Design a protein with these regions (language model features):
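Alpha-helical multi-pass membrane segments and their bilayer interfacial helix-loop junctions
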Residues: 2-364
């Protein structure tokens, strides 16, 4: 009886590539995944969340202690203590990796960041030139200095997130609402560049997840202002009425580019499934909220890179945006039910068509 030849991984990938079942970019991604050394075990997500909450509470008590001790009386004391706390936290984190000292360093950096912002506010109030742009500049300066030297992933995630939040608040406070689309464009480009890096450094991982979360959150806020729920946001929700179509146009183009980038280039336009994906994306961009496009983009990247965190985020945001989309439809309840049922049928039909096409291709 003849023995079958056993293929190694490289030969198997070459065979699949010859049969047209995988693309060169997928081969590179698989190879880099196999060659990547095993990472050190990290704390579970809930442990890191609890650690961040504990450090935040500790930072508040440190600031409260300074206030009670009357050490923040002068106009520059906040900046001075902020710099000292930031430097102390960075030195402690680089000197020792024990749990207690890591927690202490995180609390010091949190409190130093807050104190630096408070000191900047107090200093600029003396010159009567304070506005939210002062906080943005001060926080950007702190993040630019602390991020490379302070390796705590919790701070590296929260600091950029806070920066985008401050920029959004500035847009609302200054009533330059059209800039929200420029912010979304910058977030989309930045998130795309970060998520599509071939071999991202470990130090960039928190920044990548921060970008992946802030883009849909910005669009979610913009969506909320378009419906009755937005009235509960106060004067910002009542004044903010920016149309969604510019962001939809940007995100549609970005999502189509993502398809071709992951599939191996423009040559894939000849494939039936790519034509179907592009047409479906254009229709979604025309008829739905831009948040659905972002959720689909996260879902595609999550599946492509086997990132369960991004996949989970995509499902979460997709649910939120679909609920908002159907809630905002200006039709009666019966028609909404028909639209939801029809959407489900279309999705099931699309899945069946793609599965049938893939089955035929494998058989060939």
């Amino acid at each position: 009886m003849a023995h079958k030849k056993l293929l190694n991984i490289r030969e198997l990938m070459e065979t699949l590539f010859t049969q047209g079942l995988i693309t060169p970019s997928q081969m590179k991604r698989i190879a880099s995944k196999l060659e990547k050394p095993a990472e050190e075990s990290k704390d579970p997500l809930y442990i890191r969340i609890l650690s961040g909450v504990g450090a935040w509470v500790g930072a508040l008590f440190l600031i409260l202690f300074l206030g009670i001790s009357h050490l923040l009386r002068s106009d520059t004391s906040g900046i001075v203590f902020g710099v000292l706390f930031l430097a102390g936290g960075i030195v402690i984190s680089r000197a020792s990796k024990t749990t207690f000292l890591n927690q202490l360093s995180l609390a010091l950096v949190f409190s130093g960041n807050i104190l630096f912002l408070m000191g900047s506010v107090k200093l600029f109030q003396v010159f009567r030139t304070f506005n939210l742009s002062t906080l943005i500049i001060a926080h950007t300066l702190v993040v630019a200095v602390a991020y490379p030297f302070f390796s705590n992933s919790i701070y590296r995630f929260l600091a950029p997130t806070a920066l985008v939040t401050l920029i959004t608040l500035w847009i609302l406070d200054e009533k330059v609402f059209f800039l929200i689309h420029f912010l979304i464009a910058v977030e989309m480009l930045f998130a795309g560049i970060m998520l599509l890096l071939k071999k991202p450094k470990a130090s960039l991982t928190p920044l990548i997840y921060s970008a992946a979360i802030m883009l849909p959150l910005t669009i979610l806020f913009m969506n909320l202002t378009q419906v009755e729920i937005g009235r509960g946001l106060g004067r910002w929700g009542e004044a903010f009425r920016e149309p969604l179509w510019p962001s939809s146009l940007l995100l549609t183009a970005g999502l189509i580019y993502l398809y071709f980038r992951l599939a191996g280039g423009l040559k894939q336009i000849r494939n039936d499934w790519m034509i179907l994906a592009v047409l479906a994306t254009i229709l979604l961009g025309v008829f739905t909220t831009p948040g659905v496009l972002v959720a689909i983009g996260l879902l595609v990247i999550g599946y492509s890179f086997d990132d369960h965190t991004l996949t989970g985020l995509s499902y979460l945001f997709l649910t939120c945006f679909l609920v908002l989309f159907y809630y905002a439809l200006n039709i009666n309840l019966a028609h909404k039910s028909l639209v939801i049922a029809g959407s489900g049928v279309v999705l099931l039909l699309t899945r069946w068509v793609l599965g049938h096409m893939r089955f035929e291709r494998v058989n060939r």
